[in-house]
Amino acid sequence: MNIHEYQGKEIFRSMGVAVPEGRVAFTAEEAVEKAKELDTEIYVVKAQIHAGGRGKAGGVKIAKSLSEVETYANELLGKQLVTHQTGPEGKEVKRLYIEQGCDIQKEYYVGFVIDRATDRITLMASEEGGTEIEEVAAKTPEKIFKETIDPVVGLSPYQARRIAFNINIPKESINKAAKFLISLYNVFIEKDCSIVEINPLVTTGEGEVLALDAKINFDDNALFRHKDIQELRDLEEEDPKEIEASKYDLSYIALDGDIGCMVNGAGLAMATMDTINHFGGNPANFLDVGGGATKEKVTEAFKIILGDDNVKGIFVNIFGGIMKCDVIAEGIVAAVKEVELTLPLVVRLEGTNVERGKEILNESGLAIEPAATMAEGAQKIVKLVKEA
């Protein structure tokens, strides 16, 4: 689950991570009124969407007067902001964050992530702040420093100071930076985060260490422990199909292709998409129905896939372990009838009760194209979609 920058900064502030003063606004008039509450001569007007790259896309403006705040607010509100993370359609700006300007001396990057190679939380930092960290990793990887954190001990003060030294934080601000990083680590742990990232972290002319950005992703599996965080969810920023999928415990991510995929298991789903790509097709989604799919789940999965107007065919790839192939087959038949499917459909079943599952599909009288293997199924659906 993602949240807006201003919500992330409220969490930071509550846990001792230093941030500039700011206010959220939903209209240009409100933006001016909120700006009046800030003790500053420089205002930063920030578009609030669930995507990075807002600054480069024109979503962050520096205002030197209240009239400029109003001008920029009118310019941004209602705008479709297109960044490298939104896709060409962009995202509509519906709220703004009005923040105090500050005397920036230097920008840095810091982030806490989970390193799958070490199975540990890792602190990453660089003095190349304000730049996409992926770009830094590609061009100057030597400028990225890491500290692997012992889960028993947590982020040690010496690790925090070492990172601060390595990224050339001014000596007089080292202790403040170390305290800042330890507080940021506490946010990661106590809020069950999957990512906590600040780009940029800055040092100021007054010797302060501040977070000028706040990117926080939460572990969806831990949200039941954080009712307050659940309330921060902005459904308008999410794909309606993904919201609907979550109601039925389906893992769905929309993509840009035209072949809908329904698979059980994340690994098989990834392999299925790779195989479709290998044979010249383009997956329209990632959809994992999980290990306990029912007829109702399968029907809803079909409805969600068909909610994408770009879909021209569907590939169902099921390996029945805990989940039985005959149950899936019954669900497919019921779903195809209910949604009155007219698009090409290829189904590959393997595993428990597979022969009975195939019989159910064959006896249904529906236009379902069977496949014996994943490769065969991918080839068939790519061919059918291209011919459609």
UniProtKB/Swiss-Prot annotation:
Amino-acid positions noted as binding Mg(2+) in the UniProt annotation, renumbered to this chain: N199, D213
Pfam families tied to this protein: ATP-grasp_2 (PF08442), Ligase_CoA (PF00549)
Pathway annotation: Carbohydrate metabolism; tricarboxylic acid cycle; succinate from succinyl-CoA (ligase route): step 1/1
Name of the molecule in the record: Succinate--CoA ligase [ADP-forming] subunit beta
EC assignment: 6.2.1.5
The reaction(s) this protein catalyses: succinate + ATP + CoA = succinyl-CoA + ADP + phosphate; GTP + succinate + CoA = succinyl-CoA + GDP + phosphate
NCBIfam families per UniProt: PRK00696.1, sucCoAbeta
HAMAP family registered for this protein in UniProt: Succ_CoA_beta
Lineage: Bacteria, Bacillati, Bacillota, Bacilli, Bacillales
Necessary cofactors: Mg(2+)
Cofactor-binding details, from the entry: Binds 1 Mg(2+) ion per subunit.
Binding residues annotated for ATP, in chain numbering: K46, G53, R54, G55, E99, C102, E107
InterPro entries named among the record's database cross-references: ATP-grasp (IPR011761), ATP-grasp_succ-CoA_synth-type (IPR013650), ATP_grasp_subdomain_1 (IPR013815), Succ-CoA_synthase_bsu_CS (IPR017866), SUCC_ACL_C (IPR005811), Succ_CoA_ligase-like_bsu (IPR005809), Succinyl-CoA_synth-like (IPR016102)
SUPFAM superfamilies noted in UniProt: Glutathione synthetase ATP-binding domain-like, Succinyl-CoA synthetase domains
